[in-house]
């Protein structure tokens, strides 16, 4: 009698070929086993002490990669030179990169892997990079570094808003809290700061509930991390990050990879951002979108601003959360101190 065969979603082409050879499943017609997926997710979401120790090693080297960038960035060099200095730290520790380095003066373009630009005075470089240990465990951090010794006053105003959102999210981490609530909190803090500067108007939380915050934060707040930097991404966010519950389809909110209640043993990133995306500004203004919340006249004066993100890695504990690895400079004065 034929028995059902359980298999996971295929992620690589060679696995699709094997599935076809073994079971006759044509690529694109796969029907992965949800019970199998949930079994793997429920095993890998909870990190053992041995796994935490390995991730900690990755995060320590990842921190050193970011410290190297903070000492390297300056006007007159290319983004590629910063990326090379960052990669050197990982390779010197006999580690791999956990994902291709993002080192860009165009921080408003998410997941931008081009490194061809020359860094100029007045720029900021957004670095998103991590190390992967010999056992395959990942680190993942982001930094935003001024090209000059200090942030300009214009940069500092926005940077401090991002840091406030980051610190508010970290302070909220604890078992039992839905991560979507942490996301909304960080977005609310960003809207409060931007309202003080005249970019948005109205109640900050209403701005978030309406979805207008996605002009400035069209992405999520963080993701699970482990053997994959976006852990088990190929198994499906609805299972990994939402425990089988439906995700939002709203622009911005739909990019939140993690929304479920946090539990001890989870390892995740915290990475709110504040982005000024010219193409999105043009689109929404042409659609008269969220005019009750967004001050487009003010916003358009920041079309050339770029974007800001800082990111750290945390373990959810029995009573709260613990930073993994060593602390890197995040507050503006900390970054500027290492830039001197």
Regions found by a protein language model. Name each.
Residues 1-340:
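Active-site neighborhoods and metal-handling regions in enzymes and metal-associated proteins
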